[in-house]
Design a protein with these regions (language model features):
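Extreme N-terminal leader/targeting segments of oxidoreductases
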Residues: 1-14, 33
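N-terminal Rossmann-like FAD-binding beta1-loop-alpha1 element of flavoenzymes
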Residues: 13-39
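Short hydrophobic core segments
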Residues: 16-18, 208-220, 361
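Active-site substrate-recognition segment that forms the wall
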Residues: 29-33, 43, 55-56, 61, ...
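Dinucleotide-binding Rossmann-like beta1-alpha1 core, especially the glycine-rich loop
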Residues: 56-138, 305
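Short beta-strand to alpha-helix junction loop
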Residues: 72-75, 107-116, 154-173, 292-297
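Helical element adjacent to the flavin cofactor pocket in flavoenzyme catalytic cores
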Residues: 154-204, 208-212
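C-terminal catalytic lobe of FAD-dependent flavoproteins
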Residues: 309-394
Length: 394
């Protein structure tokens, strides 16, 4: 059954997407591609966490205990990336989003790290994933800039990368090309009519009516006024500081693939771009809405990266940024309908927003056109938190 009632409201559209980061943009683009009249509201579309993110597509390397349910979603989305990149290029006159099938190397610097990596390797094998254990010498043969003290590592040839800034720009262009109407203003309040989401009022007073509303505002998704308390998106901001350096021609190639490690319990990664940029990240800080780049954050990232790749201290530091990841209570995304008819969520992607972009767009477009959430997304419905919510509001 087609779930949208086309043009039913004043200024009516089929779909209103609130939020213009990569998740909101991909949702709007895919909805428009399926023939839905789509409107998007965001004061700075293409901005948000994607401007800070490193762009690792690493479902295998980022596998964590207790998060195995996310694995299938991540693998399915990573598998879609080559075709997704090609479709975006077709839609935007050849835009390159920096998709690079370069692989990932996760390394250990001491005995504890080595044990941790061995356990990760065992978990990967139990999940049927492809990864190869390497000695320290084999790691350095692959990446000669690694520190002499590297004790071993995991080579994952299927974990790749994309440039999130290029991705965001391409998605914005694709939306414009597909006829999405973009209001460069924030949504201030959800409109609810007859116990159904019916659109939103923008900061400038504009009223947008729509048959279906998708809340895809990242870490801000829980702050929209007018949303009934029982369906407020349970997301929190998690700060991440990230550095960007430049690899001069004399030092190239500095790294040929993404390199990751756990250093003193903190995760650090180095993502080399083909244009000579090297992205180093990321801190993970539960500090509310603070996006200050701190001396301590920069120091910790450079210190850990230096232990991994000592030559990094010779590179020019070109940018420091901090962004906010949208974390849900179980750190898995919120995809699909809420208990308020007409209101859907596409948020809470936490560390996996870039990775899950292709699949999120596909899943949300299917929901918006058929009223059915695809099976792969059903474990991530916002309704998984409804029972606990109802108890707390009782």
């Amino acid at each position: 059954m087609h779930s949208s009632r086309k043009g039913s409201g004043r200024n009516g559209s089929d779909v209103l997407v609130i939020g213009g980061g990569i998740i909101g943009l991909v949702t709007a683009w895919q909805a428009a591609r399926r023939g839905l009249r789509t409107v998007l509201a965001d004061p700075a579309p293409g901005g948000g966490a994607a401007q800070v993110a490193a762009g690792m597509l690493a479902p295998v390397t980022e596998l964590h205990y207790g998060e195995e349910s996310l694995l299938g979603l991540g693998l399915a989305s990573a598998e879609r990336y080559p075709q997704f990149a090609a479709e975006l290029a077709d839609a935007t006159g050849g835009t390159d989003i920096g998709y690079r099938a370069c692989g990932t190397l996760a390394v250990a610097l001491d005995a504890d790290d080595r044990l941790h990596l061995r356990e990760l390797h065992a978990l990967q094998r139990r999940c049927g994933l492809e990864s190869e254990w390497l000695t320290g010498r084999e790691c350095r043969r692959l990446e000669p800039m690694l520190a002499p003290g590297v004790r071993g590592g995991l080579r994952v040839d299927g974990d790749h990368q994309v440039d999130p800034r290029r991705l965001a720009a391409a998605l914005l262009a694709a939306c414009e090309g597909a006829g999405v109407t973009i209001h460069r203003t924030a949504a201030e309040r959800l409109l609810v009519t007859a116990d159904r989401a019916a659109g939103a009022v923008l900061d400038d007073g504009t009223e947008l009516r729509a048959d279906q509303v998708v809340l895809a505002a990242g870490s801000l998704s829980g702050r929209l006024a007018g949303v009934p308390p029982e369906v407020v998106a349970p997301v929190r901001p998690v700060k991440g500081q990230v550095l960007r350096l430049t690899v001069p021609a004399a030092y190239a190639p500095f790294l040929s693939r993404t390199v990751r490690a756990v250093v003193r319990g903190s995760h650090v990664y180095l993502v080399p771009r083909e244009n000579g940029e090297l992205v180093v990240g990321a801190t993970s800080e539960e500090l509310g809405w603070d996006t200050t780049v701190t001396a301590g954050g920069v120091y910790e990232l450079l210190r850990d990266a230096h232990e991994l790749v000592p030559g990094i201290t010779e590179l020019p530091l070109t940018e420091t940024r901090a962004g906010l990841r949208p974390g849900s209570p179980d750190n898995a995304p919120l995809l699909g309908p809420t208990d308020l008819p007409g209101l859907h969520l596409a948020t809470g992607h936490y560390r996996n927003g870039v990775l899950l972009t292709p699949l999120t767009g596909e899943v949300m477009a299917e929901l918006l056109t058929t009223g059915e959430l695809p099976d792969i997304a059903r474990p991530f419905t916002p309704r998984r938190f409804s029972a606990a919510r109802q108890e707390s509001f009782a």
